[in-house]
Curated annotation (Swiss-Prot):
This is Lysosomal acid phosphatase. The membrane-bound form is converted to the soluble form by sequential proteolytic processing. First, the C-terminal cytoplasmic tail is removed. Cleavage by a lysosomal protease releases the soluble form in the lysosome lumen. It comes from Pongo abelii. Its EC number is 3.1.3.2. Disulfide bonds join 159-370, 212-310, 345-349. It is found in: Lysosome membrane; Lysosome lumen. GO terms for cellular component: lysosomal lumen; lysosomal membrane.
Length: 423
């Protein structure tokens, strides 16, 4: 009986200690989403330009060139709906201005894409409906003039060092081989389109025009066969790599996509330390913006970002209290976003590792790094000019000294003959 009582006493004691621990020790904090940054491309649009022999000129498009279409509006409304579902429980179901901030480039198509996206993300309900027949509410989208945009409009410029890198890229074997392989093809396209300045760097415009026309049911010219379109598409992707890679990718990143990455890093750090930003920060921009950022992160898949594609950064606070970053890319509307892993880090990347690994592609002083360093030839010119300038200065000093002494000398005496003044 004593042993039995002793057993019950030990069991009771363990339960008591467990109860005390539950009361004294705080419960473990569950992993939680703290902050989201989105960068998306605008939706379907009309061509940004056409070519001289194109039978479909600007009047063929209801709003002209470079404008968001109804298809593009729907694409972004659907993306907004998908984001609403993904972040249910994180964002309020109704719009609260303290929770979200949206910035766009100053183009009609990106501004309108952001507005369509917000219509899907935050449909009005209850008191937010200003008209019972309209399931929409105005939500602010911020922008700056194109000439002042140093965050979302790429490639950034003017930047002499970047232009120098591009000239050096043109001399690489990869660029030279690509140019040689496609010389006759580019001549054919130039002849069919009427363009006189077609290069590896500009041929994407032809593909873009034909792609937009084909997407909207317009008949392509006979020369634009499926094989030609496929080849144009490949050259279009090459032009993106030319802008931000192929040669000195890390330095190009510091001058281009690293500028945006620097702001994203700053925001992630700020939210991990002070929580002073909105829960959701949205950037509405272009395919070049996405490629510039993904090349800086070294996660670019080599293909043009499709309409309404979206790069996602999610900041989590782990149950340990530390923070981690997860990235996703939504480039297909009927599939879940693809997980992206920063090279050298798992998909759930600790924030400190994310910051450390991306540090090399973030500029310290963009204006300074954009300057072209003086080469040996430039140094010789500078020295020669300095020597010439010094010699000229000495000659001027010598000349002034002589003139000064001549003026300081007293006037000489002149003998006058007797009677000279008496004629």
């Amino acid at each position: 009986m004593a042993g039995k009582r002793s057993g019950w006493s030990r069991a009771a004691l363990l339960q008591l200690l467990l109860g005390v621990n539950l009361v004294v020790m705080p419960p473990t904090q569950a992993r939680s989403l703290r902050f989201v940054t989105l960068l998306y491309r605008h939706g379907d649009r009309s061509p940004v330009k056409t070519y001289p022999k194109d039978p479909y000129q600007e009047e063929e498009w209801p709003q002209g060139f470079g404008q968001l279409t109804k298809e593009g509006m729907l694409q972004h409304w659907e993306l907004g709906q998908a984001l609403r579902q993904r972040y249910h429980g994180f964002l309020n179901t109704s719009y609260h201005r303290q929770e979200v901030y949206v910035r766009s480039t100053d183009f009609d198509r990106t501004l309108m894409s952001a507005e369509a996206n917000l219509a899907g993300l935050f449909p009005p309900n209850g008191m937010q409906r200003f008209n019972p027949n309209i399931s929409w509410q105005p939500i602010p989208v911020h922008t700056v003039p194109i000439t002042e945009d140093r965050l979302l409009k790429f490639p950034l410029g003017p930047c002499p060092r970047y232009e120098q890198l591009q000239n050096e890229t043109r001399q690489t074997p990869e660029y030279q081989n690509e140019s040689s392989r496609n010389a006759q093809f580019l001549d054919m396209v130039a002849n069919e389109t009427g363009l006189t300045d077609l290069t590896l760097e500009t041929v994407w415009n032809v593909y873009d025009t034909l792609f937009c026309e084909q997407t909207h049911g317009l008949r392509l010219p006979p020369w634009a066969s499926p094989q030609t379109m496929q080849r144009l598409s490949r050259l279009k992707d090459f032009s993106f790599r030319f802008l931000f890679g192929i040669y000195q990718q890390a330095e190009k990143a510091r001058l281009q996509g690293g500028v945006l990455l620097a702001q994203i890093r700053k925001n992630l750090t700020l939210m991990a330390t002070t929580s002073q930003l909105p829960k959701l920060l949205v950037y509405s921009a272009h395919d070049t913006t996405l490629v510039a950022l993904q090349m800086a992160l070294d996660v670019y898949n080599g293909e043009q970002a499709p309409y309404a594609s979206c790069h996602i950064f999610e900041l989590y606070q782990e149950d340990s209290g530390n923070f981690s970053v997860e990235m996703y890319f939504r480039n297909e509307s009927d599939k879940a976003p693809w997980p992206l892993s920063l090279p050298g880090c798992p998909h759930r990347c600790p924030l400190q590792d994310f910051l450390r690994l991306t540090e090399p592609v973030v500029p310290k002083d963009w204006q300074q790094e954009c300057q072209v360093a003086s080469g040996p030839a430039d140094t010789e010119v500078i020295v020669a000019l300095a020597v010439c300038g010094s010699i000229l200065f000495l000659l001027i000093v010598l000349l002034l000294t002589v003139l000064f002494r001549m003026q300081a000398q007293p006037p000489g005496y002149r003998h006058v003959a007797d009677g000279e003044d008496h004629a």
